[in-house]
Amino acid sequence: MPVYENKHRPITDDERRMILETIPKHYAGTMVLTMLCCGLRPIEIRRMKWDWIDFESAILTVGKSKTEAGTGRKIPIPPVLLDALKEHKAKELNNEYVFVKYEKHTRMDDNAFYQSWKNFVKEMDLANGAHLYRNQVKNSIIAPDFEPYLLRHTFCTDCQAAGVPINVAKEWMGHSDISVTAKIYTHMVDEVFEQNRMRMAQYAVTKSQQVESSTATN
């Protein structure tokens, strides 16, 4: 059984493309989309219940139902995932858990999670140039380190790219210490660099205009 931890890179744009193309075609697609859009840990995916989801407010509360007292870890659900979860729920009306064992429809354990992930990656691989020989994938184009925690790391870097403050991302990720979040945020992606470069350029222009205006009125 592989160990899903210490994966310190986001997925590439090409990996994201392959994931998004495979999601609609695979039984584990909604599970993978949830990891990508909400940054859940594998154990949280396995424990995820329908009453964690508030479909009206589009909020996922990890570890607590929306009717329980107290606060859980709240994560916003983007529209694309909300629609996928609604469709998925129609297939799993009699289950307490969102993601269950394939065909058996019972609670997913770690082995079932791994098998679902492995099967998803295999489908993704075959759809992008690999082929089967004696039931073994040949000429794989998937990176050897492509494992579930990469999606969690990607969610965090997506937060950074979208301009989410680090203290908010820390809460969404469920990190006990903001230094853990900071280790991810310090790996600045190109688009974040460009966004902030433009902000600083605009600030410099605005500040110069303010100084010129102040000088002109004196």
What are these regions (language model features)?
Residues M1-R46, E56, T67-G70, E92:
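Basic, Lys/Arg- and aromatic-enriched nucleic-acid-binding interface segment
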Residues M1-V3, H131-N139, M198-A201:
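Short, charged hinge/linker segments at domain and secondary-structure junctions
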Residues P2-Y4, P10, V62-E68, H105, ...:
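Catalytic-site neighborhood detector that most strongly recognizes the C-terminal catalytic loop/helix
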Residues K7-H8, G63-G72, K101-D109, K138-L150, ...:
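Short, contiguous acidic/charged loop-to-helix segments that flank catalytic cores in large enzymes
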Residues M18-H26, C38, I75, K91-Y97, ...:
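Short, basic (Lys/Arg/His-rich) helix/loop patches that form interaction surfaces
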Residues W52-I59, D145, V164-I184, K207:
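Short, polar N-cap/turn motifs at the start of nucleic acid-interacting alpha helices
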Residues S57, E87, K91, E103-H105, ...:
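C-terminal secondary-structure termini that scaffold catalytic or DNA-interacting sites
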Residues I59, G72-P76:
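Well-ordered beta-strand positions in beta-sheet-rich domains
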